[in-house]
């Protein structure tokens, strides 16, 4: 009875946030419910088939793909809009369904996983992101490892071409290891298990302690991040009985095309070295706008810019804007790449003639500001 009353109150707060304050209200119900009923996560998760998705990059798009596959089995709810902290998970669980697919922030995975006891956890990747909050990658990997040890009945699905994902899966009792032929990891010089230097042979690694990406249960061809996440989504969904579905890779890219007075702009989300590298590889236009902010959700520390090669932008017309535009412009200058700093995105986009096609790589806050405007 107390839980039901708490849910009613939480929903009223959500209604007030949406209708009166004109806000999204996606996390307010969950935030209120956790205050009123701290054990809401575990209670709402009872007798439900739950799948969790976590990783530095690709969580939202992969969650959408898993949800699409799972929905063929029965009623399904998801937080695929990106509200991935514990309060977002609770808000989603407040909706009735047989299946629940949750995107979960890397640091919040411990609480959500241990309280919901999911059928499946898909671990996509792990790399430096929001250093002021995440600190070192190894810290998050150790947390994931403890989760794997604590949930013997949960099946862990992971891309072990990432040594940090491999570390977590090594401790899982039930797991499906996946390899896409290997790829270099910028943070993978040292073995996250024993601290010795990893031995890399082309794109594959192994350590004397036994950590390796070779001998995965499922060995697939290499491809883009969207391609990899599409396969991981189908593998995770198959654990609970879903049949593989065709997934258009473009659907998994965090990109939107918008028109600005005749200028077609392809907006792509970039928030850390891995996502920047992926986005840069997808730049097809000769006109590019780069937007860098450094707010809390973007990551206050921008030192990671020096981990990225911008060579693919050489000889293109590059405009740089955002709160930390000078940091980015200087980084490009050091690599010998010319750019122009412009005060705002609105002024930058107007510098291109009508019918132009422009690639826009934008920080988290800038991306969603443009998408929602």
Locations of regions flagged by a protein language model:
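Phosphate-binding loop of NTP-binding sites
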Residues: 4-176
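A short acidic, amphipathic alpha-helical/loop segment
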Residues: 92, 110-116, 164, 168, ...
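Extended acidic/charged loop-beta regions that coordinate divalent cations
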Residues: 102-129, 168-224, 252-253
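Residue-level signal for inorganic ion chemistry
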Residues: 103, 124, 157, 229, ...
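Short, polar loop motifs at secondary-structure junctions
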Residues: 106-108, 160-165, 323-326, 344-347, ...
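Active-site beta-alpha connecting loops in nucleotide-dependent enzymes
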Residues: 185, 263, 269-343, 365-366
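Gly/charged, well-structured mid-domain segments that form the phosphate/adenylate-handling core
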Residues: 233-270
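A glycine-rich beta-strand to alpha-helix segment
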Residues: 347-373
């Amino acid at each position: 009875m107390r839980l039901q009353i708490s849910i009613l109150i939480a929903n009223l707060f959500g209604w007030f946030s949406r209708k009166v304050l004109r806000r999204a209200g996606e996390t307010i119900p969950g935030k209120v419910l956790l205050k009123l009923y701290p054990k809401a996560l575990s209670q709402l998760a009872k007798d439900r088939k739950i799948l969790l998705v976590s990783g530095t990059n690709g969580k939202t798009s992969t969650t959408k793909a898993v949800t699409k596959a799972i929905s063929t089995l029965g009623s399904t709810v998801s937080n695929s809009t990106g509200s991935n902290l514990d309060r977002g998970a609770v808000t989603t669980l407040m909706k009735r369904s047989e299946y629940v697919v949750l995107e979960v922030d890397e640091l919040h995975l411990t609480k959500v996983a241990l309280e919901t006891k999911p059928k499946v956890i898909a671990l996509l990747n792990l790399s430096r992101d929001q250093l002021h909050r995440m600190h070192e990658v190894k810290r998050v990997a150790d947390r994931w490892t403890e989760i794997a040890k604590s949930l013997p009945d949960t099946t862990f699905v992971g891309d072990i071409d990432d040594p940090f994902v491999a570390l977590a899966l090594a401790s899982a009792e039930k797991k499906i290891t996946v390899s896409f032929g290997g790829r270099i990891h910028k943070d993978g010089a040292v073995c996250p298990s024993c601290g010795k230097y990893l031995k890399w042979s082309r794109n594959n690694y192994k350590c004397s302690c036994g950590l390796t990406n070779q001998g995965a249960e499922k060995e697939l061809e290499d491809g883009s991040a969207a391609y990899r996440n599409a396969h991981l989504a189908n593998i995770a969904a198959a654990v609970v009985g879903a049949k593989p579905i065709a997934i258009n890779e473009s659907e998994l890219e965090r990109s939107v095309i918008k028109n600005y007075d005749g200028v077609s702009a392809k907006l792509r989300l970039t928030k850390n070295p891995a996502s920047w590298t992926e986005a840069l590889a997808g730049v097809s236009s000769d006109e590019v706008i780069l937007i860098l902010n450094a707010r809390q959700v973007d990551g206050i520390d921008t030192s990671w810019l020096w981990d990225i090669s911008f060579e693919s932008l050489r000889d293109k017309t590059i405009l740089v804007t955002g709160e930390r535009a000078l940091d980015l412009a200087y980084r490009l200058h050091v690599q010998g790449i010319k750019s122009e700093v412009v005060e705002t995105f609105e002024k930058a986009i107007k510098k291109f003639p009508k019918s132009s096609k422009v690639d826009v790589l934008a920080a988290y806050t800038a991306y969603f500001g443009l998408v929602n405007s």
